[in-house]
Amino acid sequence: LKGYINLAGSLVVQNAGRPTYVPSKYDWGWDFSEGLARVLIHKEVDLYGFVDIYGNEVIPPKYQYAENFSEGLACVYNGIKYGYVDKNGYEIIPLKYDEAGNFSDGLAKVRIGGKYGKYSPILDKIEIEDARYGYINNLGIERIPILYSHANDFSEGLAAVCMHNKWGFINRTGNVV
């Protein structure tokens, strides 16, 4: 594991003011997100898992890729499909997507085959329409029409979108700014 050191340079993970040593079986580690840090073991195939702030392995390294936790879930990849796990390692949203991203404001952008859409955890379904992007809220209600050939997640109230090969920004009501 690389990256969790104290002021003396010793490998540690801080918790409640006392250091805890992390087993050196990990080849890499990332920043903590929502109380867990991604770790990596290099084998024939890289394997990702998660440790808590005490250095305990919470989710064993078994995924070929993983993202940091966002809104209580982490996107993981098993070498074939993407899905989402909770902080206990349970696959809450099945690994059935060809592409998936982090949750942002209750939504996650996902892709099945050549089609794109937004996954709603509340409705446990994906809204897809002719490989176009739009935005729905966490209740599955379409908030911004599905019009865009490409769309990014919202950040600081704006999202970059593409229509007719032209990029611009929209606000949360769908107005171009």
Stretches with model-predicted labels:
Residues L1-V177:
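Residue-level detector of conserved, function-critical positions
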